[in-house]
UniProtKB/Swiss-Prot annotation:
The protein's name: Interphotoreceptor matrix proteoglycan 2
Alphabetic keyword roster: Cell projection, Disulfide bond, EGF-like domain, Extracellular matrix, Glycoprotein, Heparin-binding, Membrane, Receptor, Repeat, Secreted, Signal, Transmembrane, Transmembrane helix
Hyaluronan-binding motif involved in chondroitin sulfate C-binding: annotated span: 1083-1091, 1139-1145
Chain ranges on the Extracellular side, renumbered to this chain: 29-1104
Sequence ranges of Polar residues compositional bias: 211-229
Gene name linked to the record: Impg2
Domain of life the protein comes from: Eukaryota
Domain EGF-like, first and last residues per copy: 1013-1054, 1055-1096
Domain SEA per the UniProt entry, residue ranges: 235-349, 900-1013
Cleavable signal peptide: 1-28
GO molecular function, one term: heparin binding
Biased composition (Low complexity): 431-443
Name of one Pfam family that matches: SEA
């Protein structure tokens, strides 16, 4: 249900009045008047949705006025984001505060507009675009609301709501004026000055207020043929309940529906309480009305909510009984609580069933709220009628409004707003002044007319004459036997201070079946100021052409004019020249999507007013509507300088070329001109004149229009064939710096002016759609216009590129050109009101989102064609996304689109399934079965709605009912906003799964993140005993258990002590030490204990002592053995060394020794010592091979023989021999002998 929150609407309006310079006093007086006017209403009327819209709006204003004093004031002087720097002056600080105020107001207004009208959050580009318009002052908040309410997307949402109703019965209009035919007075003698014709829907509240303020201006003098239809039975019943929530504390913030606490509690309450009503037959929805503080005690919160049921679900008798005795309900106990009630309820079991169900949900732990079953009260039950919407179609043959019943309008929507068809007012005769703009700001007169005029008034109050019925339907008989029927759903009021674009119009002369030409009404088009050089051209009418399947576009067969002779010609508009004038039989529509601009000096004008063929053109839908090309042309004018009465001369214009225009609204990041365009009243009763430059006569050319859309079965289509038709392309150039010529050439289907270096604006070509109006794009100074045609039989598009610096601004209307020799083409067009009830396929849209092909910049030397880019935005509809504050504009809007990731993660929670431990184990049968089930459900759903979809991987299941974490892989990079698309698909999947597969998926738990921005660990089932590690190469996340914890069968990490009960033996105690792992604490006795990693070793005290003694003894033995071994080794080494020493000495060495011993008394005194010294060696004489070389190379035997031959005794010989050996073996002794020998010498 789409509705305005009264508080948000009024508060936002007051803020904007400060921003736009409005008068707060007048607003307060108006609100007081409303409050005074509604004082006579009873409380029952204030809650009745069937009351007229005017009364309900007054009630809303009164209720809002009561809530104003409850708003909490700011606790700080300035909000976040506004700071006062010490260096700032007072003026700079004030400017900063105003800038912040504008940004905050625009942010809130944009968010509320998207949520209210389009039921979704804005994308990045569209959010930035609207921020630019709001902050630059191009559009106000109220104008923004009007534009959103006129959009096709808003009406599509309403139409989708209608398709769910079951009864298609007509209903009476009650207090609102409506009927099978709508008519409006035709002004005579006084006309309104406008710049186009359009049909649009205005802000419902504003429309009703204006009509109430000036009712006499919207009353017709003619008797209207209104057929009253009987009131059908109620199609819906709304039951209002009240229940108290225990455990909650009421706060003043719950009075504000826009507060975060209020929204959070509403979502939580609906998600919990809805379970009790889901099982009831005919249940449709539930919404919270308000929260109240309990009167008896201060604890808890009283919730006032309403539940909607189908009309046939509950009998009227039961509802009447419940309504009469709602305060006298007897508690007969809980009867058959486990069984859901049937279609007819009684007083007791209906109330008791709801109360018991809520209580059971709380006891079972399925609810976080604690509703008091005893406090449940049924306050009121009322029936609501569902009126039918009326299909208004355009009829070119008759002038009556033909209304056909096509669908049912939701009752709540009907009660809140005026329906689109009930607020239609039309004007058929106007003075159209395309150049009647003013470059200054909107005047006070324009503001007053805008705010005080009634719904049907445009500028002035004309003199009423017989009404001319507005025909908005086209039958196959009228349109030359064609099978097309176009529909229009949202006509409305013209906003005085906005640029306009045509919505629908007929050709100047309508060709009927009987070959009669119906002359159009007088339409004055004041394009340029008249001058003395203007000469009239006679009126011509083109004879009709009969074709059973074609709609002919008529024009004059030729048009000749000379620029050389006269700079301008006064051309009186013929009825057959659709390019110059037409019968305006439709409303004027505001072109809401481009910033207000003013025009200077130079422009390029493509006349196309009245070039339609009687078909109503769909209303603009800014770039998110799924439709196709639109046919229409519309001139846009500028304020012609009064100083310039003549046009600048042009060197040559070869010929006029016919255009069949198309344009898609592109978000603009710039504001052009000095001020917004607005319309002024102009008294003119003469036929319009349009100066046209032409050098040579042009031959009649054929207009071939092709409309491309997806194939839709059973949809009427039409084709446009070759017909003598001419749309004049008017090029009027003027320059403030130079008065040189501007050459306009048309070569090979291309119209071009001098190119130059680009400045500021990207060149773009847009694909238009049938629900879009042609709009005008203003280029900054120094821009060039290229009109490119195709010679290969395909329609080409216009491209905007740079122009020379000497040129002033150009007004360009993007157009399609087609050579005359091309054959006609026929394509189907999708009707605006067609509602396709199917899963929304956004695969094509995702491929086109953000696909920007940028043209290269041109220098002055480059004159070649410029590459254009095509931007196809997506139509993504998602609801209930969390509010995320997006940044405000930071300069020029960036259109750079980067390639997205190949992986997108998402998770969802299934609430009606119980989790089991086996779902942790990916190898378990239960896991595989559930995984296969979700793959079978999700893969076809995603594959059919996402282009580039490769595969879906179920990562894991987590506890929390059942949380499914998944990963989607794409074959190629996806757009950055693919998250929104997947969120929308999953949200729709939640609804489908609940209705068809009994899977209750909590859509509030949906979480979608792209691979580049997502945290892979977020979608892993890692518990507190593990940590998530991400592979930097593959991006894969994995859970790693902490030391002392293990994962068995991919279950969450658990302690080793729990997984292995026998980890510690002999009654040891297992414990996990953080960072170290599991350890065992072993038992200890008086003289024994256990030890080891798992306490597997037993240790006693005697055993330890014995081991200690044995260890010491063993150590000593080992030490002794080592010492003995070392001694032996040293001794053996000495012996070996003695044997290896040489025994040779000099020949006199022996005699010197003998002389030393013989003649040295000191030596003799020491002889006994030497004998003692050598005594140990006597037993073990040391023989060495070296001793043989000691004495002159004589061996020991030779020395002995020498001594035996002497007189020495045997003892002396032995003694000398020992001395010699000692001398030879002991270096110290040898040194001693030599020392004493030297002393004697």
């Amino acid at each position: 249900m789409i509705m305005f929150l009264p508080l948000g609407r009024i508060s936002l309006g007051i803020l904007i009045l400060f921003l736009t310079g409005g008068n707060l006093v007048s607003v307060s007086e108006e609100i007081q008047d409303r409050m005074h006017a509604v004082a006579v209403l009873s409380p029952k009327e204030s809650t009745d949705l069937s009351l007229p819209t005017r009364k309900r709006q007054l009630l809303d204003a009164t209720e809002t006025g009561r809530r104003w004093p409850l708003r909490r004031r700011r606790s700080i002087l300035f909000p976040n984001g506004v700071r006062i720097c010490p260096s700032d002056t007072v003026a700079e600080a004030v400017a900063n505060h105003v800038k912040y105020f504008k940004a905050r107001v625009c942010q809130e207004a944009i968010w509320e507009a998207f949520r209210t009208f389009w039921d979704r959050l804005p994308g990045r580009e569209e959010y930035q675009y609207w921020m630019n318009l709001c902050e630059d002052g191009v559009t106000s908040v109220f104008e923004m609301g009007t534009q959103f309410s006129q959009s096709v997307e808003h009406r599509h949402l309403i139409m989708e709501k209608l398709t769910y109703t079951k009864e298609a019965e007509s209903s009476s209009c009650k207090d609102q004026a409506c009927g099978p035919e709508l008519s409006s007075p035709v002004p005579i003698g006084e006309t309104s000055t406008l710049a186009g014709a359009v049909s649009s829907a205005s802000y419902p509240g504003a429309a009703s207020e204006r009509s109430a303020a000036s009712p006499q201006e919207s009353i017709s003098n003619e008797i209207e043929n209104v057929t009253e239809q009987p009131t059908p039975p109620a199609a819906e019943q709304i039951a209002e309940f009240s229940i108290q929530l225990l455990g909650k504390q009421y706060s003043e913030e719950l009075r504000d529906p826009s507060s975060a606490l209020y929204r959070l509690l509403v979502e939580e309450f609906i998600s919990e309480v809805e379970k009790a009503f889901t099982g009831l037959p005919g249940y449709k929805g539930i919404h919270v009305l308000d929260f109240r503080s309990p009167k008896e005690n201060g604890s808890g919160i009283d919730v006032h909510y309403a539940v909607t049921f189908n009309g046939e679900a509950i009998s009227n008798t039961t509802w009447d009984l419940i309504s009469l005795h709602s305060n006298k309900v007897e508690n007969h106990g809980l009867v058959e609580l486990d069984d859901k009630p049937t279609a007819v309820y009684t007083i007791s079991n209906f109330r008791d069933y709801i109360a018991e169900t809520l209580h059971q949900n709380f006891l079972m732990g399925n609810s976080s709220l604690n509703p008091d079953p005893k406090s449940l009260q049924l306050i009121n039950v009322r029936g609501v009628l569902l009126p039918q919407t009326e299909e208004i179609v355009w009829n070119t043959q008759s002038s009556s409004l033909q209304v056909t019943t096509s669908s049912i309008l939701d009752n709540t929507l009907q009660a809140e707003w005026l329906s689109a068809d009930e607020s239609i007012t039309t004007t058929t005769t106007t003075t159209i002044s395309p150049f009647g703009f003013s470059s200054g700001p909107p005047s006070a007169t324009g503001r007053e007319l805008h705010s005080e005029s009634t719904l049907g008034d445009i500028v002035s109050t004309p003199k009423l004459a017989s009404p001319s019925k507005v025909v908005l339907s086209s039958s196959p008989e009228v349109l030359g036997g064609s099978s097309l029927t176009l529909h229009s759903v949202t006509p409305a009021v013209l906003q005085i201070d906005l640029p306009v674009a045509p919505e629908g119009r007929t050709s100047g002369s309508s060709i009927l079946e009987d070959d009669n030409t119906e002359e159009s009404e007088d339409v004055s088009i004041d394009v340029l100021p008249s001058s003395s050089l203007i000469q009239p051209v006679p009126k011509e009418t083109v004879p009709p052409m009969e074709d059973s399947d074609m709609i002919l576009l008529t024009s004059s067969p030729h048009l000749t004019s000379s620029v050389i002779e006269d700079l301008a010609k006064d051309i009186t508009t013929p009825s057959g020249l659709d390019s110059l004038a037409s019968r305006v039989s439709d409303k004027l529509d505001v072109s809401p999507w481009f910033p207000d601009t003013s025009v200077e000096k130079e422009f390029i004008f493509e006349s196309g007013l009245g070039s339609g063929s009687g078909k109503n053109v769909d209303v603009i839908d800014w770039p998110w509507s799924e439709t196709s090309l639109e046919k229409t042309t519309e001139p846009l004018s500028k304020s012609w300088s009064e100083e310039q009465d003549t046009l600048l001369p042009t060197e040559s214009i070869e010929k006029l070329h016919m255009y069949f225009t198309e344009q898609m609204i592109e978000p603009s990041a710039h504001r052009y001109g000095d001020g917004p365009i607005y319309f002024t009243e102009e008294e003119s009763h003469v036929r319009s004149t349009i100066p046209i430059f032409a050098e040579s006569a042009t031959q009649p050319t054929s207009l071939i229009s092709s409309k491309h859309t997806s194939d839709v079965p059973d949809i009427d289509s039409y084709s446009v064939t070759k017909a003598p038709f001419l749309l004049a392309t008017i090029a009027n150039t003027a320059s403030t710096k130079e008065t040189d010529e501007v050459n306009t050439l048309l070569k090979k289907g291309m119209v071009q002016t001098e190119p130059s270096s680009p400045k500021g604006l990207d060149s773009k070509i847009s694909v238009a759609r049938p629900d879009m109006q042609p709009v005008w794009t203003i280029l900054p100074e120094s821009d060039t216009v290229w009109a490119r045609t195709s010679s290969l039989g395909k329609l080409s598009r216009d491209t905007l590129v740079s122009t020379p610096e000497s040129a002033d601004r150009l007004w360009l209307k993007a157009s399609m050109t087609q050579p005359a020799e091309l054959p006609p083409s026929t394509h189907s067009i999708q009707l605006e009101d067609e509602v396709i009830m199917a899963v929304q396929n956004i695969s094509l849209e995702l491929d086109q989102v953000g696909t920007d092909y940028y043209q290269p910049e041109l220098t002055q030397e480059q004159n070649g064609k410029v590459d254009s880019y095509v931007e196809m935005p997506t139509h993504v509809h998602y609801t209930e996304m969390p509010l995320v504050a997006q940044p405000t504009k930071g300069g020029v809007l960036s259109r750079t689109q980067t390639a997205g990731a190949l992986v997108v993660f998402f998770s969802l929670r299934v609430t009606n399934m119980l989790f089991s431990e086996d779902l942790f184990n990916k190898n378990s049968l239960e896991y595989k079965a559930l995984e296969q089930r979700f793959l079978e459900l999700l893969v076809p759903y995603l594959q059919s709605n996402l282009s580039g979809f490769q595969n879906l991987e179920i990562l894991n299941f987590r506890n929390g009912s059942i949380v499914v974490n998944s990963r989607v892989k794409f074959a190629e990079s996806v757009p950055p906003n693919v998250n929104n698309a997947i969120y929308m698909i999953l949200e729709d999947f939640c609804t489908t799964a609940y209705q068809t597969m009994n899977l209750d998926i909590d859509k509030y738990s949906l979480d979608v993140e792209s691979g580049d921005d997502a945290n892979p660990c977020k979608f892993q089932a890692c518990n507190e005993f593990s940590e998530c590690l991400v592979n930097p190469w593959s991006g894969e996340a994995k859970c790693k258990c902490h030391p002392g914890y293990l994962s068995v069968d991919e279950l969450p990490c658990q302690s080793v002590c729990d997984l292995q009960p026998d980890f510690c033996l002999n009654d040891g105690k297992c414990d996990v030490m953080p960072g170290h792992g599991a350890i065992c604490r072993c038992r200890v006795g008086s003289n024994w204990w256990y030890r080891g990693q798992h306490c597997e070793e037993f240790v006693s005290e005697p055993f330890v002592i014995g081991i200690t003694i044995a260890s010491v003894v063993s150590l000593l033995l080992v030490a002794s053995a080592v010492v003995f071994f070392l001694a032996k080794m040293l001794q053996a080494q000495n012996v070996r060394r003695e044997r290896q020493r040489p025994t040779n000495r000099q020949p006199d060495s022996l005699s010197s020794v003998e002389n030393a011993m013989k003649y040295n008394p000191a030596y003799e005194s020491r002889l006994a010592g030497c004998e003692q010294y050598e005594k140990p060696y006597s037993q073990h004489p040391f023989y060495s091979s070296a001793s043989e070389e000691v004495i002159g190379g004589l061996s020991r035997e030779e020395i002995r023989q020498m001594y035996e031959s002497s007189d020495l005794s045997k003892e002396e010989i032995q003694e000398r021999m020992r001395i010699l050996e000692l001398y030879a073996n002991d270096p110290e002794f040898a040194a001693f002998v030599r020392e004493h020998e030297m002393e004697e010498l």
